Amino acid sequence: MAAIPSRKGVVVHINVFTVAPEKQQLLVDSLIETVNEARKVPGWLSARVHRSYDGTRVVNYVQYESQEAAQAVLRHLAAGGYLKRNTELGTVAPGQYEVVYTLDSVAGLQT
């Protein structure tokens, strides 16, 4: 399991998508493609894609080194049509956050 650092300056975007169950996997695949493109931009740190068991939600969790890096990634993805495609597959409720605390199981961090 990847650690989520709580260091100063790291910007976190958590996007919660509501999606029709028949489109959930399409959105998951699209978000995976999107984060693989995003990782090419300096300042991008990490991403996670989660799907709900009931098929109606997908959550995308992304970390950036700074606000500037987050904006650069979003501009890059918008120019490539990634953001438009994702929002055509589901309705997104975006949010920007700062990590203030993390706690991990020692066993969960072993590889």
Residues covered by each model-derived region:
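Short acidic/polar alpha-helix capping motifs at helix-coil junctions
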Residues: G9-H13, P21, V100
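Short beta-strand/turn micro-motifs at beta-sheet edges
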Residues: M1-S6, A47-V49
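Short, well-ordered beta-strand segments in beta-rich or mixed alpha/beta enzyme
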Residues: V11-T18, R48-L77
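Short, low-order "capping/linker" segments at domain edges
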Residues: V99-T111
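Short, surface-exposed ligand-recognition loops at beta-strand->loop->(often short) alpha-helix junctions
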Residues: T18-S30
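An amphipathic, aromatic/His-enriched active-site/gating alpha helix that lines ligand/cofactor pockets
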Residues: S6, E37-L45, Q63-E98
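Short amphipathic alpha-helical/adjacent loop interface patches that line ligand
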Residues: L31, V35
